[in-house]
Amino acid sequence: MSHGPTRKHTALPKAQILIEALPWLTRHNGKTVVVKFGGNAMIDEELKAAFAQDIVFLHHAGLKPVVVHGGGPQISAALDRHGIVSEFKAGLRVTTEDAMDVVRMVLAGQVQRELVGLLNQHGPLAVGLTGEDAHTITATKHQPEIDGELVDIGRVGEITEIDTGAIEALLADGRIPVVSSIARSQDDGHVYNVNADTAAAALAAALGAETLMVLTDVEGLYEDWPDSDEVISRLTASELEKLLPELASGMVPKMEGCLHAVRNGVTTARVIDGRVQHSILLEIFTDEGIGTMVVPDEEEGDAV
């Protein structure tokens, strides 16, 4: 009997932490959240395991997580192993037919499989698919303009259409969809590599998601990089649009994705530091958000 009060006392802080999450649990219950998995979190074993725990936690907390992933580091390593030299133009990987075979193999056969495996350590939850499956992502050949001229960068696609049917069926069945950023073209039947940040944003908008969350290797969007490491914690779509021309090239597709999402019905888009374990939970279930949140212009002050 003498241990009773002590036990009660030591358990109280845990109860307090759980109760603090209640307003967020209420707010996000039943809502869809699209999470773009990328950066250092993809190659660090502890971060990968923590990411899987976070996604499963969201699922069991009543949210509907959808994971979208790329595989930059793994693709580069596999291309090196196959003796295929990676070339970049306008920040986009030039994807030859040979390279596309490797990209597809790595994304659908390695990165996706590993992620599905990590999630399924917690139960029969995750199902992997690519944008090719059930016409989830349709694309056309992307030809960027450099110095006024269209440049051929091979099998790189621009998203033209999203079909959410397969993902919605999986969510309705209580599963966690894990989507590889590969798409097929209806024009030429070819398979294309699409930017995973762009794919995540397009899926978030098409699904009517509450939140788009993009994991990065930085703390968020910096106020005045490189002169300052002050992170902008919140900004509107219009404010972000003004900043886009000044951003480092690696951040452009991420922030353009956030802009597209909030301008197409997504309540908030967040760029968070994927190097911090459980950063997803910190961002969703506390008021101490650790990244940059983008909100629609008309809802400034209302979005949370």
UniProtKB/Swiss-Prot annotation:
Gene3D superfamilies: Acetylglutamate kinase-like. Belongs to the acetylglutamate kinase family. ArgB subfamily. It is found in: Cytoplasm. Its EC number is 2.7.2.8. Pathway: Amino-acid biosynthesis; L-arginine biosynthesis; N(2)-acetyl-L-ornithine from L-glutamate: step 2/4. It catalyses: N-acetyl-L-glutamate + ATP = N-acetyl-L-glutamyl 5-phosphate + ADP. Its main location: cytoplasm. GO terms for molecular function: acetylglutamate kinase activity; ATP binding. One of its GO terms (cellular component) is cytoplasm. The record marks 36, 254 as: Transition state stabilizer. Catalyzes the ATP-dependent phosphorylation of N-acetyl-L-glutamate. The lineage of its organism: Bacteria, Bacillati, Actinomycetota, Actinomycetes, Kitasatosporales. Substrate binds at residues 71-72, 93, 193. Keywords: Amino-acid biosynthesis, Arginine biosynthesis, ATP-binding, Cytoplasm, Kinase, Nucleotide-binding, Transferase. This is Acetylglutamate kinase. It comes from the Bacteria. One of its GO terms (biological process) is L-arginine biosynthetic process. InterPro entries: AceGlu_kinase-like_sf, AcgluKinase_fam, ArgB, Asp/Glu/Uridylate_kinase, Glu/AcGlu_kinase, NAGK-C.
